[in-house]
UniProtKB/Swiss-Prot annotation:
Family affiliation: Belongs to the universal ribosomal protein uL1 family.
Function summary: Binds directly to 23S rRNA. The L1 stalk is quite mobile in the ribosome, and is involved in E site tRNA release. Protein L1 is also a translational repressor protein, it controls the translation of the L11 operon by binding to its mRNA.
Annotated GO CC locations: cytosolic large ribosomal subunit
Keyword Repressor: yes
Protein's name according to its UniProt entry: Large ribosomal subunit protein uL1
Classification via HAMAP family: Ribosomal_uL1_B (MF_01318_B)
GO biological process: regulation of translation; translation
Keyword Ribosomal protein among UniProt keywords: yes
UniProt source species: Anaeromyxobacter sp. (strain K)
Record CDD domains: Ribosomal_L1
Gene: rplA
Length: 234
């Protein structure tokens, strides 16, 4: 543990907690502060000037990261007939209907994402207590309830990430791995921020993006220059 603490301290000393970093420098620091032997995930913590207690200020969405998430996504799809065939041809790992629901009720959870056609939501809805707590319930707002399965499957396989503002007005979203080149991390992060700026509720008052911090799984937080972000996404 002392060795771990020493490595974290050395990483943290590279970061000036009082400074807001330009994106290029922030992405470079993210890589420098990744100290674990495994390939750490890089996350953004985005503090928004919204009150999620009001339904019209719930910020949520999804974005296909230009450089993916650096991992293979196992995808399950609820569909029948021609739509089941469409999902299989697009690259879905598991495709089913009532049979898949029975497997999930029996404890099968060998997938990372779940998509369904609208007509299958009656079946999927019965799995709410299993899927909901795991964040796997399909939702039309993020494109996981759809008739366009070919597109949905390809997007998920390419590295589509979903986000939703939490109670404190914070969005947590992963955007790559510490092994990524800084330019790829920057492109993925910029794609997320583009969607978040566009998702600003009309009823939100004052400053919308109040703080942005980047970090690896076990690394220190790195604050981002908000003026640069605002200029890029004006």
């Amino acid at each position: 543990m002392a060795h771990v603490a020493k490595k974290y301290k050395a990483a943290a000393e590279k970061v000036d907690r009082t400074k807001r970093y330009k994106l290029d420098e922030a992405m470079s620091l993210v890589k420098q502060t990744a100290t674990k032997k495994f390939d750490e995930t890089v996350d953004a913590s985005i503090n928004l000037g919204v009150d999620p207690k009001h339904a019209d200020q719930v910020v949520r969405g999804a974005v296909v990261l230009p450089h993916g998430m650096g991992k293979t996504v196992r995808l399950a799809v609820f569909a029948k007939g021609d739509k089941a065939k469409e999902a299989q041809e697009a690259g879905a790992d598991i495709v089913g209907a009532e049979d898949l629901a029975e497997k999930i009720q029996g404890g099968f959870m060998d997938f990372d994402k779940l998509i369904a056609t609208p007509d299958m939501m009656g079946v999927v809805g019965r799995l709410g207590k299993i899927l909901g707590p795991r964040g796997l319930m399909p939702n039309p707002k993020v494109g996981t309830v759809t008739m366009d399965l070919a597109r949905a499957v390809k997007e998920q396989k390419a590295g589509k990430v979903e986000f939703r503002v939490e109670k404190a007005g914070i969005v947590h979203v992963p955007f790559g791995k510490a092994s990524f080149d800084p330019d790829k991390l920057k492109a993925n992060f910029s794609a997320i921020m583009e969607v978040i700026y566009k998702a600003k509720p009309q009823t939100a008052k004052g400053v919308y993006v109040k703080n942005v911090t980047l970090s690896t799984t076990m690394g220190p937080g790195i604050k981002v220059d908000l003026a640069e972000l605002a200029a890029q996404h004006a």
